Design a protein with these regions (language model features):
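Conserved catalytic core of nucleotide-sugar-dependent glycosyltransferases
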Residues: 93-194
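Hydrophobic targeting segments
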Residues: 2-7, 23, 33-36
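Short, high-confidence coil segments that cap the C-terminus of an alpha-helix
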Residues: 80, 139-143, 210
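Short, well-formed alpha-helical segments that are part of the catalytic scaffolds
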Residues: 7-27
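C-terminal catalytic/acceptor-binding lobe
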Residues: 15, 19, 193-315
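Acidic metal-phosphate-binding loop of nucleotide-sugar-dependent transferases
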Residues: 88-92
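Active-site-proximal specificity loops/subdomain of glycosyltransferases
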Residues: 38-80, 93-102
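Short aromatic/hydrophobic "clamp" motif used to bind/position activated sugar donors
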Residues: 83
Length: 315
């Protein structure tokens, strides 16, 4: 079985060093091919020599999204049985350190919160999650695994045709038979671009049991601290969802989730806004919690709307 882990980044090396360390483990200890693509020559030149010895590090200033180098090269794409596209968004996790092959104990400089030792070798953790994800795909389900960022497994016969309107999540749901069902379900909410909201599809599929989702850090920490923009199910299991996902899932499944304190608040959905996911994420500092109408949610976990609006954690 041949596997390629592909990453694209627009962040300086120091911001993604932790991820580079994980990728080096995958390459050195598991023999997995790793391809890291930089969009900036300045950042590309910052990468220490030892990482080039373990993985393929490319420079493509014209690339616009993760996987451009793969989807534009059918020879590379069809060479592997599985391609794992990993997001490089590690900026808020940069204080998590890797010590002697283990996730160590540190204090987040921005929040002052402790992170706790997990006492599990990182390499073993990565191997287990990747193997489990591939098994999920082989069983006909779509695997969505988070590892200090987002790592998702794609079917090898998927052809990326339009990065603005097609997502691997949607494609996988189509393959699993949930895509049409999800679209029909979401249309009742009158969203301007149903096809652009793969966060909806992911949450919907997860609730149906089709998506495997787990943040390694959240799943293994002995205490539920340090991850501000996430939600937790009433039964205590974690759902790795972004701030944007939280609003979607909250609206779709009242009572299924309870809020944790949000780092940047909530995103307001405005009719006619046609920038899709990226546009909403760019606006999330403006469209914060106070702008979103939470009163319509009938959620037993919300005891006081004003506390939610002020950013307090409501148990």
């Amino acid at each position: 079985m041949s596997v390629l882990v592909s990453v694209i980044s627009h962040r300086p090396f120091k911001k993604v060093k932790v991820q580079f360390d994980y990728l080096k483990i995958l390459a050195d200890e598991f023999g997995i091919d790793v391809q890291f693509q930089y969009q900036s020559k300045e950042y590309y030149d910052q990468v220490p020599k030892e990482y080039f010895e373990s993985m393929s590090i490319l420079l493509d200033e014209s690339a616009t999204c993760a996987g451009d180098n793969l989807y534009n090269s059918s020879k590379t794409f069809h060479k592997y049985d599985y391609i794992l596209n990993m997001d490089d968004d590690l900026s808020r996790f940069s204080d998590v350190v890797l010590k002697e092959g283990k996730l160590g104990h540190t204090v987040n400089s921005s929040t002052g919160r402790d992170y706790y030792d997990v006492n599990l070798e990182s390499a073993d953790v990565l191997n287990r999650f990747i193997k489990d994800g591939i098994e999920k795909i082989n069983s006909g389900n779509f695997a969505y695994v988070t590892m200090q960022g987002r790592l998702f497994c794609e079917y090898r016969d998927y052809v990326w045709k339009d990065t603005k309107s097609t997502s691997s999540t949607q494609f996988a749901l189509w393959r699993s038979g949930l895509f049409k069902e999800a679209i029909d379900y979401f249309r009742q909410f009158e969203f301007p671009r149903v096809h652009g909201y793969d966060q909806f599809y992911r949450a919907y599929a997860m609730d149906k049991g089709y998506t495997y989702s787990c943040n390694i850090r959240m799943a293994l920490y002995t205490k539920n601290q340090g991850v501000n923009d996430s939600v937790i199910r009433p039964d205590g299991t974690f759902a790795d969802l972004s701030v944007l996902d939280t609003i979607f899932v909250k609206e779709l499944y009242p009572g299924m989730f309870k809020y944790r304190k949000m780092r940047t608040g909530f995103v307001k959905l405005e009719p006619g806004h046609d920038d899709g996911i990226d546009g909403y994420l760019k606006d999330r500092e403006i469209n914060t919690l106070n702008n979103h109408n939470l009163d319509k949610f009938n959620d037993p976990y919300i005891k006081d709307i004003s506390k939610i609006r002020s950013g307090e954690y409501v148990k």
